[in-house]
Each structure stands twice: as structure tokens, then as C-alpha cells.
Amino acid sequence: MNKVAQYYRELVTSLSERLRNGERDIDALVEQARQRVMQTGELTRTEVEELTRAVRRDLEEFALSYEESL
């Protein structure tokens, strides 16, 4: 598995759990995650931006489906 896919899985898993636990500010969650990934230096800026977009998109979908299931 490449590094982008690995980070994607880790971030979606951890951030989804935080959403389940009551955090609701997706922008803040994604920004914190972006900063953590940037600090590792393992991905290029372009990879980080693509990763961030994908994570944000999927978290927003998760949040909508989670709210609908309540």
C-alpha cells in the first residue's frame, strides 16, 4: 500500500471515531490532520492536498449518513 493510501486509511479511521465521539467541526479536524501529515515530511505538498480533499469529502459523507441514522 502506498503512503498516501496508508495515511488516508489512518486519518479516516481516527477522524471518523472522533466524529462518533461528538466532535463536529470537520474543518478543524481535517486541518489538524493535514498539519500532522505535513510535519512527517513523508508526502509532497500535492499529495497532502489531494489526501486532505479526499478525507474531507469522505468525512462529510460519513457525518451526513451518521446523522441520518440517529
Walk through the language-model features, giving the residues of each.
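Amphipathic alpha-helical membrane/lipid-surface binding segments
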Residues: V4-L70
